[in-house]
Amino acid sequence: MKIHEEIEGHIGRTQAESEPWWPTPAHPGDDAPNVVVILLDDMGFAQLGCYGSDIDTPNIDRLASGGLRYTNFHVTPLCSPTRAALLTGRNHHEVGMRAVSNFSSGYPHMRGHITDHAATMAEVLRDEGYATFASGKWHLAAMEDASAAGPYDQWPCRRGFDRFYGFLEGETDQFHPELVYDNHAVEPPTSPEDGYHLTEDLVDHAQ
């Protein structure tokens, strides 16, 4: 089997006649913006101060004032399809997420995960040199693919994220969560008796 690899150096007959070459790592540029995406389940856009709500949301409003605000993103009543659309920028039907990702239906375009033919936002950013991290709920892999034994191909670290801390399925216990750190199942750092709560733990790892 012949394997061809592009090289900008030179391969001569001997090492002395050869010139090595290393590709330049991708870099987004010194002026590249940070990209922060916050997805909340069961909340409407009108509940945020930056969209005119009377509810005080100063931290979210501060992020919005220095970034971009969209007004026409299509959401669904289900979690996984909305997440798939947000991460890919495409209609959820086009990327194989017609319903929640709890199981593979056995039919095309409903395998319980984003199709491998669709790039995620994290994959695009990573290829441009960004460091990528996700914290929280994933819910984009079928339950049979979410065990500690894998397969891991639809886990966050295989869909563009360098690091991940959170849980893979649609829900988990807030005091005794089934946590994943990158590609490893881990125990919560403390117990509920010592004040543990999942929300605070996720925020701590996101900082």
Where is each model-derived feature located?
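Formylglycine-dependent sulfatase
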Residues: 1-207
